[in-house]
Amino acid sequence: MEESMKKLPILLTIFVVLGLLATSLVVVHSSSAASLEEAIAKTPVGTEKGQINPDAPKGYLGIPGAPSLNLIAGLLWAIWVGWIFSSVGAFGGIMAGVGHLTVFGLGDYAKTFKNTSPALNKLVTDSIRVSNQWLVGLSAAISSLNYYRMGRLVAPLGIALAVGSVGGSILIPILTAGKIKLSAYQGYFGLAVFIIGGFLFYENTPRGQSRKKEAKAAAQAFEKSIKEKKTAAELTAMGVKVTNFGLTSVSFTFFGVEFHFNPIVAAIGGLFIAALASFLGIGGGFLFVPFLTSVAGLPMYLVAGTSALTVFVGMVVSIFSYMVLKATMVQWSLIGMELIGIFIGSMIGPRTSKYIPDIWLKRLFVVLAVYVGLRYVSKGFFGTSWVPPY
């Protein structure tokens, strides 16, 4: 009973926010459709690339000749997206982007209109950005609840980051919606991922790990408890406990190890991270993870849940900004199926991540960052992928 009451406020908050967001989106649907029809009308008619054939079957967003999406493939890909985000607190938006841009072919499709119909190019690009964020938003909500129940979420730190993230999540859609071409989006997307991957690679070196004694000690204590097969209740009891709360300093313990952070620094970090994440059309977890491990000094076992809480707030604000303030459209049939997959993957991730050593969670992060970064830097800035699929 006490546990249920403990998580009730978070559940109610998430459902209220999602309800308000959904209501607002229904109101602006007609405006979004009008923008799409106007962009299609300005596109040259024909059967060549960069042209619209009115007689072709309707595909993505109802555009004649656009890719026809396989909803089952969307479901399966979303399970992977939900699992990876809920396991490491990052790469949900990036993997959603890989699916929408590459697996479904929306990236190459949008590129065909680069010169013939810039308005349609940018409209599809914005749609991809928001679609990514819908998937990450739900995964973040589910992951936050799961990790909170497990005692693996630092709520004060997540809230401080979220407060700062609100400004960035509002500002970027207003400044960039309808102004970013697909090629530039892909290039910047990959560059940001590649840089962060290199940063996390350094943290995996002996020199990088030597600076994180508290995180290493806490991770070892947690891993020892898992090997001893302690019950879920015992693990939760040794989880996050806030011992001191102040405007400039917050302290908490995790498996007997004490940690400290400055909420003001966290809020400032959240502002810049959310701004970049909103521009890239992703959740920002791949930026929050290095912030939480390097600046806050947390072990990976606390990073996923704390990152998820912050990402959830940023995603709600950013989706609202894109779809309500800038009338961006999404393919609701695809999003609906993908959200089912996200739910499945996000329920599995927190339950499997505890069996993966802390260092291997970081290494998984690095491998994915290098692959995704190389692919989109090369495709965005050089016109061809250096890694498969080419």
Residue ranges of predicted features:
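Short, non-helical or kinked segments that cap or interrupt transmembrane helices
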Residues: 87-104, 111, 124-131, 152-159, ...
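Alpha-helix capping/termination and helix-coil
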Residues: 275, 279, 283, 295-299, ...
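Juxtamembrane transmembrane-helix boundary motif
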Residues: 2-86, 102, 106-117, 122, ...
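Hydrophobic alpha-helical transmembrane segments
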Residues: 106-111, 129-143, 203-210, 253-254, ...
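Transmembrane helix-bundle signature of multi-pass membrane transporters/permeases
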Residues: 99, 129-136, 162-166, 304-315, ...
